[in-house]
């Protein structure tokens, strides 16, 4: 890089010439070799300047390189500012080249795991070009200063560009290291969970960074405690975002009350927040105050967030992961069985779920909190119509006609007792969205619990799947005998069966009420069979890859839809 006349065009041509000569070198090597060539002259100059007054040889060589021109008082006054500008720009350019080197080292990671690297690697040729052209411009400026010709190379455009590039590289490298920390934590956790040894080891690796002081807040005393309280315990990890409701928190309170008596099981809330703010901390404190169990108070991103999302299918909706004292996962999400069976699902393991999933008498557990008189009716083993729907007119018509059917002499003479339970109404007969929400939430939880097994769905599961497909229809009906689900149907077809009661009531004594009801309904749906559609909320956990229709042997089509109820926390669904 010999002295050239100042000017951006000349600097550009010189840079292209350098790139051409170094064509066979990597991009980071191109930048380093160019900087090394400049450093040779630049370093010589300042070394000679340093030794100028004490070494005769240095003084003689310095005269040849025009060092005194710069060092003498007029030179310092004339070129002092330019020298500082030059020095600062070289330092910034050196940092750019070092950053390019660091990015090159990080290419051992897949860009799928470290997305920050994807665009950064594409920008490296451009960044190196600007590093080299800046070095060329600095060389020209050095020649102008030592030549004392009154000319100068304008460096401010190069300084602006280099500083922009440097800021981008700093942010990229910082983000890349954060993403690498996540992937390394993920790999570490996978290894730990393959050969677990103790629940506390798993818990620390899942939540805290190395330099953090792990602790919990005891919700019953509001005091900080050591994580040693989890030692040799079965731990229920209640994992959620801050967008949870009091209703969702209350689901765990009966479980907490039940397990607190024996002190072997502990519940710990792990809030998942990627970027904490003062507002989110306030929200955290409000939610935490509602929980009597332990809480992780750690205002940094959870170390194992990638593991939680990918291995436990966390999608911002609450999950409950059950871990035994040895650190082994006993259930990746026991929240479904807790919603349906509560403390009856104890100890909340896959084995416990397997036992519960074989039960056919589920309506009593699902209807807890819906109708206080219901347990008595269920224990009497009576037939019950549970019904509801979007169309109030259909609801009124069904109430009227089903009541007439229940009171018909043919039913009374056969000693058949039928009760009607309208879901979604409180004791005063008013609409209650909370009751309806709990009903569908429990139905969905029961269905997901049953479908996680890789076996053919049983009769009850198929009936619940049918019911879920009617969730947004004008009307729907569940017929149970006591707590056992007998039948579910669409409002339109069930209404027709009830309308035409006179045509089949003569068979009630001979065949049996539930059998003839189902047989006649099967006859009706041969003529009028509505489409079946099952909505699966996006955050429930692992979504089935495919689903068979509950009405026919076909595989259901898959659609994606989006839903907003105009409240915080948009409800995304997969259909």
Task: Kindly label every feature range from the protein language model.
Residues 323-324:
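Short, acidic, Ser/Thr-enriched surface-loop or helix-capping motifs
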């Amino acid at each position: 890089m010999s002295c050239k006349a100042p000017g951006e065009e000349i600097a550009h041509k010189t840079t292209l010439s350098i790139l051409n000569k170094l064509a066979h070198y990597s991009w980071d090597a191109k930048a380093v070799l160019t900087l090394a060539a400049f450093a040779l002259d630049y370093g010589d100059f300042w070394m000679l300047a340093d030794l100028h007054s004490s070494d005769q040889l240095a003084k003689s060589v310095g005269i040849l390189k025009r060092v005194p021109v710069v060092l003498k008082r007029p030179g310092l006054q004339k070129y002092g500012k330019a020298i500082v500008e030059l020095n600062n720009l070289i330092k910034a350019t050196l940092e750019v080249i070092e950053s390019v080197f660091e990015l090159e080292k990080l290419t051992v990671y897949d860009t799928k795991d470290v997305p920050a690297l994807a665009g950064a690697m594409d920008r490296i040729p451009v960044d190196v070009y600007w590093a080299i052209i800046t070095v060329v411009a600095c060389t020209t400026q050095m020649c102008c200063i030592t030549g004392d010709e009154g000319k100068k190379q304008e460096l401010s455009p190069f300084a602006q560009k280099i500083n922009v590039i440097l800021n981008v590289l700093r942010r990229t490298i910082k983000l890349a290291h954060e993403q690498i920390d996540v992937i390394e934590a993920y790999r570490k956790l996978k290894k730990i969970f393959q050969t677990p040894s103790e629940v506390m080891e798993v818990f620390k690796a899942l939540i805290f960074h190395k330099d953090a002081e792990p602790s919990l807040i005891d919700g019953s005393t509001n005091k900080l405690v050591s994580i040693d309280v989890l030692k040799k315990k079965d731990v229920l990890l209640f994992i959620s975002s801050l967008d949870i409701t009091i209703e969702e928190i209350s689901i765990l309170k009966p479980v907490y009350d039940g397990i607190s008596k024996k002190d072997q099981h502990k519940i710990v809330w792990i809030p998942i927040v990627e970027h904490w703010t003062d507002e989110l901390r306030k929200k955290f404190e409000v939610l935490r105050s509602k929980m009597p169990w332990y809480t992780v108070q750690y205002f940094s991103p959870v170390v194992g967030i990638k593991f939680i999302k990918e291995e436990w299918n966390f999608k911002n909706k609450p999950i409950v992961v059950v871990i035994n004292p040895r650190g082994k996962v006993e259930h990746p999400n026991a929240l479904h069985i807790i919603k349906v069976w509560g403390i009856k699902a104890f100890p909340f393991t896959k084995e416990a779920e397997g036992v519960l999933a074989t039960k056919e008498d589920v309506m009593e557990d699902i209807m807890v909190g819906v109708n206080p008189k219901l347990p008595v009716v269920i224990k009497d083993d009576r037939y019950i119509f549970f019904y509801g729907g979007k169309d109030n007119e259909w609801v009124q018509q069904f109430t009227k006609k089903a009541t007439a059917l229940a009171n018909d002499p043919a039913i009374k003479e056969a000693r058949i007792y039928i009760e009607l339970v309208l879901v979604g109404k409180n004791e005063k007969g008013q609409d209650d969205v909370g009751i309806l929400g709990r009903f569908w939430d429990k139905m969905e939880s029961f269905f997901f619990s049953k479908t996680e097994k890789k076996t053919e769905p049983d009769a009850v599961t198929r009936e619940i799947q049918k019911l879920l497909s009617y969730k947004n229809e004008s009307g729907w009906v569940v017929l149970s005998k006591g707590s056992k689900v007998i039948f579910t149907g669409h409002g339109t077809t069930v209404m027709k069966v009830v309308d035409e009661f006179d045509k089949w009531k003569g068979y009630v004594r001979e065949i049996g009420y539930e059998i003839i009801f189902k047989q006649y309904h099967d006859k009706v749906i041969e003529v009028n069979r509505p489409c079946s559609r099952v909505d699966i909320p996006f955050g429930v956990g692992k979504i089935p890859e495919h689903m068979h229709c509950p009405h026919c042997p076909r595989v259901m089509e898959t659609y994606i839809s989006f839903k907003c109820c105009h409240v915080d926390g948009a409800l995304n669904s997969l259909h």
